[in-house]
């Protein structure tokens, strides 16, 4: 298959025919094998991990031998996700799914708090309620290793080339991405994308109009005006609320350092550490609210962004810790809730504490 035949080859997820070869490449990827062994045998010597590596490769080859379709991969992911949700949450509640047609494809625009869990939770809710799972937009900043790219493309992720900066190349990349999103929707495949680049570390969930302009690149090519084209995408805002953010302290430290020093130097493996912490960390109760399909005319990206934000803020579920952080009085704010917030603050320098409080308070302030 060549780029001429498949204009999306570089960025799209793998299809069924490509699964086996991708899994073979993963098994033969020494960095991937090393990462698993480092996680599983962190306290063992490198000599021991080197000894175990061939056995792990053999085990994975046997275990993955029958995985030959995207659906088979998704069922494996579902199994691990269910185990994770049992041990790291106090339950996940979904609302709004009954409004969606199971035979339609939607563009889900979601607030972004956690790199891996946000799209995983949206997918899980759709799957449990009889809908097809989504194709997930993921930035290439998270794909610095070949094995990371393989893993993401195996699980229905497509690549957003955020690292491209040259204007001409950027226009080409935006055109390809915009076209791919429309092509996916037209062929019955829903899309998940964050409302802006990066997580809302300060708890402020606002849509970047630039994302909406990117969607319309393909519309402009087809000479369709902004309002009409946006309606054709069947945009559905999604609001995810975590009672406890496992990465809240790390986010507050980052915001504090940026405010104090003017910049923040991210560690080499910091994104991976955030992904792991977001998956294995305690999340408390979780609420995933699907909004209404946007059917009204919005003439500008800014006006449409306001409507997406209105739905996300309206459907955001406020937990007791949000109300406490915002200084509200409420019977749900127990001594345990106060103790939980205090415990978090004690882990931060005094100057950084305001950023953690704000991250929980801002969803209240935006209502």
Task: State each model region's role.
Residues 135, 139-163, 167-171:
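Conserved nucleotide-cofactor-binding alpha/beta core module
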Residues 1-106, 113-118, 123-128, 140-146, ...:
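Membrane-interfacial terminal anchoring regions of lipid-handling membrane enzymes
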